[in-house]
Amino acid sequence: MEIVAEGLGFPEGPVAMPNGDVVTVDVRGGRIMRTDANGTSQTLAVPGGGPNGAALGPDGALYVVNNGGFPWSVRNGITVPIDESGCSKPEGFTGGWVDRIDATTGAITRLFDGFDGQPFLGPNDIVFDK
């Protein structure tokens, strides 16, 4: 195993970009990170909440699913998505959403926050068929 990036709060959803960079979502940090071949990471976008899945769309943009965000605490040395009282659903929880993120500029466009009149309830991961 080789460590290729450090300083990411809770990385998920790695996406290999055409230029060789790897984009990950940082669930805990509410941000989208880009890591180059040298292991240098930088913030691409900060959608907030808990981004927890990404996919490269046919238009070259990143599509990111977001669970809405959760409180975090450390229990027995392990970071978990639960506050100190044991609650995993923060006050004001929105349920999550899907964003389109320009892979070059990091510009964020909110696309969906529900389906058929119902809000999302913590969506996780996203894929494209073609």
At which residue positions do the language-model features occur?
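Sequence-structural signature of mature extracellular/luminal beta-sheet repeat domains
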Residues: 1-130
